[in-house]
């Protein structure tokens, strides 16, 4: 039986556009995410 294709096709530009820093800073909720990750001491804040 044939399975479908793999669903994760890595693409750095799309990754940044969907989960990137500029996108997070656009909305109040996104800024809250970044500040929470800063507070927690995350090595990486966004994709």
UniProtKB/Swiss-Prot annotation:
The keyword Ribosomal protein applies. GO terms for biological process: translation. One of its GO terms (cellular component) is ribonucleoprotein complex. Keywords: Ribonucleoprotein, Ribosomal protein. InterPro entries: Ribosomal_bL34, Ribosomal_bL34_CS. One of its GO terms (molecular function) is structural constituent of ribosome. Belongs to the bacterial ribosomal protein bL34 family. This is Large ribosomal subunit protein bL34. The gene is rpmH.
